[in-house]
A protein has these predicted regions:
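ATP-dependent phospho-/nucleotidyl transfer catalytic cores
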Residues: 126-127, 131-197, 242-246, 258, ...
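C-terminal reverse transcriptase regions that engage the nucleic-acid substrate
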Residues: 189, 193, 275, 282, ...
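C-terminal hydrophobic structural anchor segments
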Residues: 231-276
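Single conserved hydrophobic/aromatic residue that forms the stacking wall/gate
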Residues: 306-316
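TRNA-binding/sensing appendages of the translation machinery
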Residues: 1-39
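A residue-level signal for conserved active-site and pocket-lining positions in enzyme catalytic cores
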Residues: 65, 110, 151, 202, ...
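Conserved ATP-binding subdomain of kinase catalytic cores across diverse folds
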Residues: 42-162
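Conserved kinase catalytic-core segment
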Residues: 94-112, 166-232
Length: 316
């Protein structure tokens, strides 16, 4: 069964990789643009990235892309551009298998839990290999830049210090700089708890940001870089990238409650946050089984959330 790379639902007989409506949502056109590269020319791509300075920060390889519009009867084509590109592409990596499929699935799980995320999808190279693609929220349709600062910048730390800090410190920054501090505080803690449940130990200072979607308004960005690191790095004993209640390991619901309470959330809001995540477990199970992950990784993800004793969901 051929499935849509955006929504994972079955395609109609004449559709390839995307429903027209899904392509419109992520790319702005009814027909998805072509990604005219293959895994075999990634080395050439890497050299092009270095020459044109189109690389983006982060451990995982990232390329900055934009769309060259096609003619009336031809689809558009992605091309590597400078840092002003409206899309970010993450190809497969040699070290860890299936990271694009894993990141896209984890972003979908966040959406199922009603957590706002950046626009995202899977897309294929010309040779059929899957990549992860996301549309930048700090760029306008015309390529202009919106103000956006991550928590490394807001806490006046260097990029190499992105693992030096705590989630309580981020909560204080959200309260200080957000135009909707109480709402953004809840949204922030939802991202943190979700990351823990799904085994994401890489939500560091640069993976939370404030941006200005309209003049003189600063708000927490939708979630991005959501990835279950526990599935690809099972040897890592840390459960979070930053400290929570003074620790990164052996976390329990009480640790989250103490930190959220200290940041200013009341008990009812905290309990509702946990309930919101608990009630989507069945939907998560169903969606994982629809994903593009290999079956063995699907089973591992299901086990992380549901089967292992005790699961992180059971601990909340």
């Amino acid at each position: 069964m051929a499935k849509c790379l955006y929504c994972y639902k079955e395609l109609n007989g004449n559709e390839r990789d995307f429903h027209k409506a899904c392509s419109k949502k992520i790319f702005g056109t009814l027909e998805a643009p072509i990604l005219p590269y293959t895994h075999n020319n990634l080395n050439d791509l890497a050299r092009q990235v270095i020459r044109s300075q189109t690389t983006l920060t982060g451990v995982q390889a990232k390329l900055s892309l934009d769309i060259n519009k096609g003619s009336k009867n031809e689809p558009g084509r992605f091309t590597i551009v400078g840092l002003w590109g409206r899309y970010i592409l993450k190809p497969q990596t040699e070290r860890f298998g299936n990271l694009p499929e894993l990141e896209d699935l984890t972003m979908h799980l966040a959406e199922i839990a009603k957590i706002r995320v950046v626009p995202h999808s899977l897309i294929r190279f010309e040779d059929g290999e899957l990549c992860y693609i996301t549309r930048r929220i700090d760029r306008t349709n015309e390529g202009g830049k919106l103000a956006m600062e991550d928590m490394c910048q807001l806490s006046e730390k260097l990029t190499e210090q992105k693992y030096k800090g705590s989630y309580e410190q981020i909560a204080k920054l959200v309260l200080r700089y957000s135009s909707a501090p109480k709402l953004d505080l809840v949204n922030f803690w939802e991202q943190v708890v979700f990351s823990w449940i799904t085994g994401n130990a890489d939500m560091h200072l640069k993976n939370f940001s404030l941006y200005s979607p309209q003049q003189e308004v600063y708000t927490l960005t939708p979630a991005y870089d959501m990835l279950s690191t526990a599935l690809v790095m099972p040897e890592d004993t840390e459960e979070l990238a930053l400290t929570l209640n003074g620790k990164k390991r052996k976390l329990r619901k009480a640790d989250f409650v103490m930190s959220m309470r200290a940041s200013g959330l009341d008990e009812k809001v905290i309990e509702n946050l946990f309930k919101k995540l608990l009630k989507v477990e069945t939907k998560w199970m169903e969606f994982i089984s629809l994903s593009f992950l290999p079956e063995e990784m699907q089973i591992s993800y299901l086990s992380l959330i549901h089967i292992s004793e005790p699961t992180r969901l059971q601990l909340i």
